[in-house]
A protein has these predicted regions:
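N-terminal accessory segment detector
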Residues: 1-114, 131-145, 151-155
Length: 155
């Protein structure tokens, strides 16, 4: 196990990068990532954020989740901003994102950038609000821009 924060970050980068490559080789990276994210997020919410209560407003829920993630030491809340309403959230994620290294590597290799933060936020909204949200990375850069939009359940 890594003994430094930098070592842990490198381990996370390699894990996420490998997971994305495996997902792409299976043919449907978004579906695979959603399954992995949901499983991990449910456990994370139970263990690391047992008192987290999301507002019914998607924007407020994203802000609260980000602050709770900051308090748990997982990521920095000061590098993320959100605006929107109950059904649509626009966010900006800065340089302190723990997944930036993986996204940058994939971008530089000409591979699709799958925003793990957007995945996590859309899954958190689905779990906590029992509502389906589509995510989109509208711009990779400094900062990254994401959009989450409430959709109807598919039956």
């Amino acid at each position: 196990m890594p003994t430094t924060k930098e070592g842990l970050q490198r381990l996370l980068d390699f894990f996420i990068y490998g997971m994305l490559r495996a997902a792409e080789s299976l043919g449907n990276a978004p579906l695979f990532m959603r399954t992995v994210e949901e499983t991990g997020l449910r456990k994370f919410l139970l263990q690391s954020m047992p008192t987290f209560q999301a507002s019914d407003n998607a924007t407020e829920a994203c802000e609260a989740y980000t602050k709770a993630g900051d308090a748990s030491g997982f990521f920095e809340s000061r590098d993320a901003t959100f605006r929107g309403d109950a059904d649509s959230v626009q966010g900006e994620i800065g340089d302190l994102c723990p997944y930036r290294g993986v996204c940058t590597l994939r971008h530089d290799e000409g591979l699709p950038v799958h925003c793990i933060r957007a995945f996590a936020l859309s899954e958190m909204l689905r779990i906590r609000l029992e509502a389906d949200f589509d995510w989109k990375l509208t711009r990779f850069g400094r900062p990254c821009r994401i959009k989450l939009t409430r959709t109807t359940w598919r039956t």
